Amino acid sequence: MKKNILENKTILLGVTGSIAAYKAPLLVRELIKKGAKVHVLMTKSATEFTTPLIMANLSRNKVIVDMFDAESQTSGAWHIELAHNCDAMLIAPCTATTLGKLANSICDTPLVSVAIALPTEIPLLVSPAMDSTMWIHPATQRSLELVRQDGALIIPPVEGDLSSGFVGPGRFPDIEDIVTVLEETLKNSSETRYETNVTYSKNDNIINNDDSPLNHIFDNATEPIEESISKDKWNAELDYELLKKKSNL
């Protein structure tokens, strides 16, 4: 029987004020179904798209929105305690605002405070979601690169229909794909080295990893060639992120 890597794992889920936050309850439900213990942190903007009550009911844990909420003050440094007692933190969706705060250690929300307090051995996964023009803006890309350099695994957005009515990059990935990336990250972080056959050329940044499960996420899809190309690129970016995480182990 295949081992469920998420069983009894403590996952911190950060939810920010992207319109994609309305999908966050589905993400919580999927993690709970796989046996994870989920603690949700929300920015105040995120509460405009889904409610702490919904997230608390699904996660079966109190949701933290306010840094100084009296019920959250279970210890002198509750955010440190929370950060040091989890198996991974996932910020999904992540806005350009929170991405910028992560890049510059602006800890004015519980979500960012906990993310910055994570020990380096605990994986931080960030799934940005925003409109295309915001995603490709140089400021967003600078923040993205800084967060990446600091050790976070970036789950890149996909191309598709956006809430603005435009079509382009910035769309929140499918829930099952985000969960798969989290599972693979936990699996790899629990090993002293990766067992997959990976080759990397510094000259041309080519990644060749035929054995990676990420390459098979979309194997059974029947879709237009444009979407297939976009998803192949998405998988390649994820493999690259995982390879860089390996080099830091």
Model-assigned labels for residue ranges:
Residues 1-126, 132-249:
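A cross-family phosphate/adenosyl-ligand binding-site feature
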